[in-house]
UniProtKB/Swiss-Prot annotation:
It is found in: Secreted. GO terms for cellular component: extracellular region. Disulfide bonds join C37-C51, C44-C57, C50-C72, C59-C70, C80-C87. Negative results: does not target TRPV1 and TRPV4 channels. It comes from Phoneutria nigriventer. The keyword Nucleotide-binding does not apply. Expressed by the venom gland. One of its GO terms (molecular function) is toxin activity. This is Omega-ctenitoxin-Pn4a. Keywords: Calcium channel impairing toxin, Disulfide bond, Ion channel impairing toxin, Knottin, Neurotoxin, Secreted, Signal, Toxin, Voltage-gated calcium channel impairing toxin.
Length: 90
């Protein structure tokens, strides 16, 4: 009888730890905006929002007046190093 109680206690403890591990939020899931990026052609506000090293947030003339919107566009090969420095995550 004592063995049955001990066995059931062990099963209950294992179950509790498994449930707690499943309910614990993943640290990566807490900040989805860091992983999210904007594809080429979509509206952006900063270079760091655009996907890839070779994309920049291009604002055409008139965008400061609200006539045009800034969007992710292809950048030259030298832009990649500047973007890496600018968009470093602390």
């Amino acid at each position: 009888m004592k063995c049955a109680v001990l066995f059931l206690s062990v099963i209950a403890l294992v179950h509790i730890f498994v449930v707690e591990a499943e309910e614990e939020p993943d640290s990566d899931a807490l900040v989805p905006q860091e992983r999210a990026c904007i594809p080429r052609g979509e509206i952006c506000t900063d270079d760091c929002e655009c996907c890839g090293c070779d994309n920049q947030c291009y604002c055409p003339p008139g965008s400061s007046l609200g006539i045009f919107k800034c969007s992710c566009a292809h950048a030259n090969k030298y832009f990649c190093n500047r973007k890496k420095e600018k968009c470093k995550k602390a």
